[in-house]
Amino acid sequence: MKRTALTLVAFIACNWAMAQNFISPNGAENAGSQPAINIAVISTKVSNADKQMELAEFNEQMGDLSGAISLYKKAAEEYNADKKYNKYGSVLLKISALLLEQENYNEAEQVVLKSALKNYSKIGSRNGQMLSYNMLGRIYFAANKLTQSMWFYTQQGILAQQLNNPSIYLDSVLGIADIKIKKKEFGLASKDLLRAEELAKASNLPQYNQRIRVSKSILTEKSKGKS
């Protein structure tokens, strides 16, 4: 029994000495042969808002827009409570876009007017205001409220020029052209589309080419119907 106890004590002492030798910052031998081990504590904490966003995006991808909207709303509330106002505004615009997709124009409008725009005005985000104007232009166009749509697309274009954002400016030109097509102002719409083509080429924005072609096709079809 005594021999066993002594053996155990010797084993523990030996291992303790080896451990001390390995981690000793003053050991010259170890300094040259062993890499320094720095244990970095990586935070894996995910906020409740981020979790809601992940679930919302999954629901959206699965086609469950109502479920996605509900989760996006929860995420928006969390971001607002955490004072992450840019994220809060972005989620609000996302909610509005999904409501627009559901043709729920009134609620889509209210989300932007009563929440997103107020948020961006409060934090002084002109870019956020510009994107809010774009969303309202789209909502009013879909709801056939063309005067309101024209006004917001125009405001979007003004801000885009001030912020030197050619992509968003081109988007506003196309939005206005689509309104003029719907109002059967075909000559004016044709001029806007020609201008849009020139802007896309000058600003190297080929991603708008397909949209321009679609608008031109609609213009041709509608103008033939008129004649």
Language model: regions and residue ranges:
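Intrinsically disordered, low-complexity regions
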Residues: 1-227
